[in-house]
Amino acid sequence: MTSQLWSSTPWVDSGNTLHKRRVPYIQDATYLHTLDIWQPKSLGGSSLPTADVLPQGKGPWVIYIHGGAWRDPLVDSSSFEATALKLLSYKDTPIAGVASVNYPLSNHPNHPTHPAPPRDSSEPVDIAREAKHPDHIIALLTAISFLQNDLGVSHDYVLSGHSCGATMTFQTVMNPGHWLGTAKGISVPEVKKPRVIAPLNGLYDLAAFINNPPESHKQLQQLYTDFTKNAFGDDEAVWKAVCPTSVADWSTEWPEGKVVVIAQSKGDGLVPYAQTELMKNHLRKTSALEVVEMKASGDHNDLWKQADEIVDIIKCAIGYLAKL
């Protein structure tokens, strides 16, 4: 069955790389239960491999989780394409493959062009945009499990995410009991956790973010409240539990963990830099992890839109992984 999922999408030529677009990682997948994969072209063949050919390269993988406040339909796996192509163009950074994961989104009734549910009640509801926690993180873990257990790749990898994708990066290495809370009967896919992560412009303490934003971001308080409640419901205890700042002892929580390469622009107009300060301080108090801060500039989405700094950050993370 896995081979059918994998083979349902062709390899396409993308310059120096091969690309599979929107590979489904579950049966009966929506368009958001998919991932994109890029891998370097093999030295030997000039023709495109058939759709059933699995990635063969040696070296670590990069798995990326897009942002968008768990709800933005215009930010998806393709947002990492410029970064993936640039990363794979460097011969001095051996990367076996890059995966960028889609996951179901929460509703966004006020989106200016793509509201969900639709404003016109006669239009069909998009079931891929009705997710509630823990749907997002369960989908991500399912995607990583598909890569590792079904395709047999990405056992050694850097996990990176932007904005809410940075939150999900930490959730991946947390004990699921933290973010599952009182949810019953939910099967959590088991994955091999990364040793190095690279969270970018992240949301790490939603309650602090909502209840006490810095003066520079106070005007966004209602926006923060809206997207948090959309994804996680009204219970503030849940907002706290899903966040990495709720972990009392990161050493026991993530024993595999070695390095966190963290970055945020101080000019981020959407997420206050105080979130990164909180997370850095929390990790230093509760773990023996090496916490490395990398330079980032511009506004919230400039990191992935411009690709230069994010490439440097991920290359740095891969460098740390290579030394372990």
Which residues does each predicted region cover?
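Short beta-to-alpha linker loops that shape the active-site pocket of alpha/beta-hydrolase fold enzymes
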Residues: 68, 99-109, 203, 298-299
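Alpha/beta-hydrolase active-site loop
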Residues: 114-151
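Conserved alpha/beta-hydrolase
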Residues: 87-112, 117-120
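N-terminal cap/lid segment of alpha/beta-hydrolase-fold proteins
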Residues: 2-57
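Primarily recognizes the serine-hydrolase "nucleophile elbow" in alpha/beta-hydrolase
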Residues: 142-213
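C-terminal catalytic histidine-bearing segment of alpha/beta-hydrolase fold enzymes
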Residues: 263, 267-324
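Mobile cap/lid helix-loop segments that gate and shape the active-site cleft of serine hydrolases
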Residues: 9-12, 27, 203, 208-251
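Short, surface-exposed "cap/lid" segments of acyl-processing enzymes
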Residues: 41-93
